[in-house]
Amino acid sequence: MESYLFKNKFIAVVYFITLNLLFIFNGYANLQRANPLENKYPIIPTPQEITYGDGELAFKTIHITASDFKNESDGLSAFFKKEGINESSNGVKIQIIKEQLPVINPDEAYKLSIDSDIKIWASTEKGAYYAIRTLQQIVRRKGQGGLLPKLEITDWPAFKIRGFMHDTGRNFQSVDQLKEQIEVLSQYKYNVFHWHLTDDPGWRLESKLYPQLQSEDATSRGKGKFYTQEDFKDIVAFCKARHITVIPEFDIPGHSQAFRKAMGFETMKDERALPTLLDLFDELCGLVSAEDMPFIHIGTDEVRNREEYVEDGFVKQIMDRVRAHDRDLIVWMEGIEVKGDSTSINQLWAQFDPRPGHRFIDSRANYINHLDPFAGMSRLFFQQPCRQPKGDSLALGGILCAWPDNNVANERDILKQNPIYPSIVFYSDAIWKGRKENKLDYWAKLPGLNTTELQEFKVFEDKVIVHRDFFFEGKEFPYIRQTDFQWNVIGPFENNNDVNLKFPVENALVASYNVDGEDYKWSEPKVGGTLHFKHFFGFPALTNEKTGTFYATMEVYSPDDRLQDFWVGFQGWSRSGGRRVGPFPDQGQWHTTNPKLWVNNVEIAPPNWKQPNLGTRTDEIPFIDEDYFYRSPTKIQLKKGWNTVLLKIPQDNNSWKWMFTCVPVDIENNQVREVSDLKFRTIF
């Protein structure tokens, strides 16, 4: 590379000056250029301190010469063997050394050095395990051996709790499917699996004291599907081997329909309800030791129905019983406030803050069932867990939650219809590395062109794409590089709540328009696969207006005539609350607000919906093709050369989400990828 670029000193100086001027012009002068090794061997989550060396370490075999952590070294040996790399006395030397590291959260910290040999330092098995997880991410096969980048890492987590939650009370998932996801969690250094075991549709953990909890009469979804006590202990052991703690949740007194039906209680005020629950929490705590399962979650949120109300002291007695088993107690915030409670851990949701003096876990604004695969990843990347750079004695960390409340037809649909795996990868960086600031401006949109923040996102996104291709083959990963896409948008034009009103944009694309005496101009380029004009949770977006009509345009270059697959959508249907703010569109509509899409002046027809015109309260009717990323892609004819894409996105008072997605995709064997030979540009 140097011999090609730098023929002599003069050219080198000119090149250097020009390059730096270019970076200054683009607003990236304060960012280091990525080392080529970093591009080839990206690590997620990003280590706290990392220096890439000069070149790579090639090896045929390995030789673990010393290890103070036998379980971890055995696991590393098994990993290499699975990769086809055996141990031998003349292999590359690997040492795993026990040593106290002078960093925050030293129990999970590690150092990793790769040069002519490999050294790992950690003070605990956890630290050694995370070092090995990092090492596993950067091994590349070459012939009969392997390659590793030369580097030095010192790493530790910003937060002590880095978790993920599944709601199996509403929708059961098999042990195998849970284990698949837990394995991925461990790869990205999560250390908590929050297991929501009970909800209105079912009580999913076997009780030998009250077997009627698993009866078909008590269960409204997935009848006969529950976890035996042996299943439960198996998952706990599987997690423990990966240094993940299970937090089981029995959510009471709300979300208790299955419990009440099973026990024959009309309301939670039935005098038998509390003794029964005390028995159930005793039974739960008896399954696993306090050392291996130190937290118990009792819910207490959303007590909104008369039959869920309880007397004062009800929840306090459950708290006392759980604490008597030497467990830390977790409750949702917002939830029932218990007089005298000063020690419960508050798990935050929506926009709630912790109670003063309480330890807390942050689950605000990161419910995966609401997340679009593109815009949602910006939120997970830029949000600051606990709204502070790192954890402390009160700010314990965060838990990413999946709440697909609606009934699902097949357990795999939970992974197909929610961006589970992309969310795990993006959030892992924020919860391990930490964030210096909470960048609320980018919770619903990507930063503007030529900003440091966009460049930071692009760098991380490139890492995600490498991980997607290396580590998620055969798994649902609905994400492509969205920083490739730039849009000009114009509006909102006043539509007086008439979504069918047409504006001059539909007649000709020109730089500006005058409508009813008001001038409209196309915006500077907006970046992203999904654009929110106004976000449904009120996060900063492109407008503060509640109604109107926007248009968006870009050009796509194709090297040939082709029928190209696109992901197209105008409403991200949250996978909860039925068809929230429905009804679902009828045939011939993209959405009830009548958005339009034209390519080269040809209108693109919406899908032939499998379940058109369903009403809002349709929680029990599973989704099939409601969202763009799990239905068949829209096929659009592209001509050779530049193709003009134009979208119309109206909004009225009856709709909730004002947004669109329109990106070309390459899908093969259910794996989505970028279309590598297409190019994109804005017009204005």
Residue positions per predicted region:
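Accessory carbohydrate-binding/adhesion or oligomerization-edge regions at the termini
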Residues: 20, 35, 39, 458-548, ...
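Acidic, contiguous N-terminal accessory segments
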Residues: 20, 28-154, 331-336, 342-344, ...
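Feature activates predominantly on carbohydrate-active enzymes
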Residues: 105-295, 317, 404, 621-623, ...
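Active-site neighborhood of glycoside hydrolase catalytic domains
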Residues: 259-345, 350-354
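Flexible, acidic glycine-rich loops studded with aromatic residues
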Residues: 350-482
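Short beta-strands within extracellular/lumenal beta-sheet-rich domains
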Residues: 544-557, 630-634
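A short beta-strand element within beta-rich, extracytoplasmic domains
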Residues: 560-589
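Beta-strand-rich ligand-recognition modules
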Residues: 579-581, 587-662
